[in-house]
From Swiss-Prot:
Belongs to the venom waprin family. Expressed by the venom gland. Its main location: secreted. It comes from the Eukaryota. Disulfide bonds join C34-C60, C43-C64, C47-C59, C53-C68. Residues 27-72 form the WAP domain. It is found in: Secreted. This is Stewaprin-a. SMART domains: WAP (SM00217).
Length: 75
């Protein structure tokens, strides 16, 4: 391929790359900004199982956090 053909191909690819994001915008952006990312506590493993918790508490998992919590009872 000649250098002129290569430059033409490169130019067309650049133009195509610029047009894709514009055509993908079906709706305008909503007003306002996103709030800061909520801060999550670090992964803490307070317990390994129900028996490692005091009294009637259970070892409850919330994502990567394991903590002793009072149980709830559902009828």
């Amino acid at each position: 391929m000649s250098s002129g053909g290569l430059l033409l191909l490169l130019g067309l690819l650049t133009l195509w790359a610029e047009l894709i994001p514009v055509s993908g915008q079906d709706h305008p952006k909503k007003p306002g900004l996103c709030p800061p990312r909520p801060q999550k506590p670090p992964c803490v493993r307070e317990c390994k199982n129900d028996w490692s918790c005091p009294g009637e508490q259970k070892c409850c998992r919330y994502g990567c956090i394991f903590e002793c919590r009072d149980p709830i009872f559902v009828k």
